[in-house]
Amino acid sequence: MLRVWNLSLLCATFALTILGTFLTRSGVLDSVHAFTESGIGPAFLLFFALIVGVSVVLIGWRGDRLRAPGRIDSPWSREGAFFGNNLLFAAFAFVVLLGTVFPLLVEAVNGDRISVGVPYFDRMATPIGLALLLLMAVAPVLPWRKASGELLRHRLYWP
């Protein structure tokens, strides 16, 4: 169950670490965390493109062999909560990626220099973080496979 999803998350994580290294080492991103400009930036960008291309091709080509016969029976199960946490973490990563890359895209398209500051990240990350906290609190008490309403009420009832 979820083998293709797990492999996709693994490949995306590795590719995004290479992208982050490119952004900080190439001088494209102006930040207190960025390093001085060096000539290694294009190599990281090429490596990033290679990793993404190979990952997409291999997952597309061999994805049918990775698919397991099982599936998530209910969203109100432990595996459903874990998958929900995965989706929320992926959304959180997308919010951070968008906040990091958006000023670069605007500058490339319009030539305008903009800045995405703390209010954007606070506004976007707070609901995702609260949902993550809720799911992390509820997931351990959910049963595997399927949960009935009565069982959920009993396990989530405050003593």
Regions found by a protein language model. Give the residues of each.
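Aromatic-anchored segments of alpha-helical transmembrane domains
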Residues: 12-22
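Internal alpha-helical transmembrane segments of multi-pass membrane proteins
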Residues: 2-3
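Contiguous transmembrane helix-bundle modules in multi-pass membrane proteins
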Residues: 6, 10, 29-159
